[in-house]
């Protein structure tokens, strides 16, 4: 089929280029409770993953993506911009933030970009959703691996106090209440735990192998 140009000459109509099927990227998650060192280890891991595979990763950290936004909203709601642990935050803002992170992850996975996601995601992991990524809205065929970073509560508290982040104030002031939210993750082949009490190069190497899929059949 043809159409006429403004000069009157026939111009062939363009046909849309068919979209090629794209395999979704891989979703890697560094999870665990506060103060365990998730972000530090995730940054170290993503550098190793890129060096080993040559693949780029979209790095998505919860605090970077939503830190300033949450401070503004909580300041309006409670007068405390540093609140990240009170019932007000957990009941009214927490799920919206996590949904936004998952939306961003999905948009990058769809065209084939792999994603390194950093955040607690405790509810989602305990519900088993990261073991079935389509339940999180991820593209069909998305492969997910989880690094759960462990640290005993006393050492976690020491590190939280040491980092002196105002966003931890509510948590520290209500420590016993916060401890009730600490859970043991479910067992699944997609999840590997790492004790970060003292950095262990060999154990970290095994974790990176797991993230690359080497530990699963």
List each language-model region with its residue ranges:
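Extreme N-terminal, non-catalytic leader segments
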Residues: 1-27
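Hydrophobic anchor at the beta1->P-loop junction of P-loop NTPases
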Residues: 30
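The conserved Walker
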Residues: 34
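Walker A/P-loop
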Residues: 39
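Conserved substrate/cofactor phosphate-moiety recognition/catalytic segment
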Residues: 46-96
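Glycine-rich phosphate-binding loop used to anchor ATP phosphates in small-molecule kinases
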Residues: 89-140
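Conserved phosphate-donor/acceptor-positioning beta-strand/loop module used by diverse small-molecule
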Residues: 139-160
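Small-molecule kinase domains that catalyze NTP-dependent phosphoryl transfer to phosphate-bearing small molecules
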Residues: 162-207, 217
